[in-house]
């Protein structure tokens, strides 16, 4: 994956591929397959959130898919308001259906939106997480700008993805965004019973805005 800008034709082709995967029956198939594979990673996110000892606040899951992680967070932390955003309207519809069944609507909200233009005001969230979504982003600079924009001063940004995502790629993109100068921590992480670390975690802590 590269962080360069892409042409409209290539971008349209990529979006068509994502629509095939994440709309209609594809959203149901995704829920029943990927959720089982990513459950250990979601448990790691819950553990990382618990370490913050948040007393209330708002958490955003970017690329939420069917909203499994959002509901996991809402159940684990009753004092948090949890939001999920995804480009796929079918995924968001599925997430809302599941949330209604689990009676979590009072503290959970799902929105259709693009990581390059998030549907939230500036400085909205205490923590933003994204799991296994970054490798779908066709460029990194604008998504990082948007994540910075909606994060509160003192907020945390955590991006979890496959280990093949290189830190140098993120650092290069960060240099062209308001995140420049903010320290990025990264580490390989193990989850579940996997003997090897198959995921990488990128983390930022915005102590204050420049």
Regions found by a protein language model. Give the residues of each.
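A short acidic, Gly/Pro-enriched loop at the edge of an enzyme's catalytic core
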Residues: 116-127
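Conserved beta-strand signature within the Rossmann-like core of class I S-adenosyl-L-methionine
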Residues: 155-161
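Conserved alpha-helix/loop element of class I SAM-dependent methyltransferases that forms part
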Residues: 37-56
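Conserved SAM-binding loop of SAM-dependent methyltransferases across substrates and taxa
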Residues: 66-77
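Conserved SAM-binding strand-loop segment of SAM-dependent methyltransferases
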Residues: 103-116
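A short glycine-rich, Lys/Arg-flanked "PGG" loop and its adjoining helix->strand segment in the class I
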Residues: 141-153
């Amino acid at each position: 994956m590269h962080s360069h800008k892409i042409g409209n034709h290539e971008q349209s082709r990529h979006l068509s591929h994502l629509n095939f995967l994440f709309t209609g029956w594809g959203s149901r198939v995704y829920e029943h397959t990927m959720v089982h594979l990513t459950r250990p990673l979601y448990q790691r996110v819950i553990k990382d959130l618990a370490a913050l000892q948040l007393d209330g606040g708002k958490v955003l899951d970017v690329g939420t898919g069917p909203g499994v992680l959002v509901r996991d967070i809402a159940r684990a932390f009753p004092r948090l308001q949890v939001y999920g955003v995804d480009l796929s309207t079918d995924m968001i519809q599925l997430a809302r259906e599941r949330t209604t069944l689990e009676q979590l609507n009072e503290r959970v909200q799902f929105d259709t939106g693009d990581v390059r233009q998030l549907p939230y005001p500036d400085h909205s969230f205490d923590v933003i997480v994204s799991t296994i979504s970054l490798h779908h982003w066709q460029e990194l600079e604008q998504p990082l700008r948007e994540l910075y924009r909606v994060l509160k001063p003192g907020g945390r940004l955590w991006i979890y993805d496959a280990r093949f995502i290189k830190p140098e790629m993120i650092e290069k993109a960060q240099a062209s965004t308001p995140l420049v100068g903010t320290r990025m921590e990264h580490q390989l992480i193990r989850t579940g019973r996997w003997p090897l670390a198959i995921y990488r975690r990128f983390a930022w802590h915005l102590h204050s805005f420049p």
